[in-house]
A protein has these predicted regions:
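Structured C-terminal helix/loop/strand segments within mature extracytoplasmic catalytic/sensor domains
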Residues: 1-146
Length: 146
């Protein structure tokens, strides 16, 4: 078997877009930060609605929602504290057990749970001793990161 071969330039581009906040996309509709705040698709750590996210934190992720399931798979980087971790979670929030009725408890149960889970793991990572300091330079983008 051969390893996944992705050119560095393409990988950098993928990293760039996976960590982008809505207003950074260049798409006019996403410039409305009231409707699309920085945490809009950052379920872990921010529950999908953070008005501000510290400049030293970047979340490279992919989210999904369907039929009461909420999912976020994220690589979370904190440049100021030199920490990184991967976290993935899925929660089911379909209390009435009826699929495709658009009646799910995303806001009441799912997003707060994912936010709290991400923040709890982040707090553990802040305290965890590391034998080796991570090299996070690959994940810095001078045009937008502090």
């Amino acid at each position: 078997m051969t390893p996944l071969a992705i050119r560095k330039k393409r990988m950098k581009r993928c990293d760039y877009y996976m960590s982008m906040y809505p207003a950074e996309s260049g798409i006019d509709a996403y410039k409305d930060t009231e409707k699309y705040p920085p945490g809009y698709v950052k379920f872990l750590m921010y529950g999908g609605d953070a008005k501000t996210i510290p400049g030293h934190i970047r979340i490279f992720n992919k989210v999904g929602d369907a039929y009461g399931f909420l999912t976020d798979a994220a690589y979370i980087v904190d440049f100021k504290n030199d920490i990184e971790f991967i976290l993935s979670a899925t929660i089911y929030t379909n209390e009435n057990q009826t699929f495709n009725d658009d009646n799910y408890e995303y806001d009441e149960i799912g997003l707060p749970f994912l936010r709290n889970l991400g923040q709890a793991i982040y707090e553990v990572e802040l305290e965890r001793r590391r034998e080796h300091k991570p090299d996070l330079s690959r994940f810095r983008f001078p045009d937008r990161d502090n």
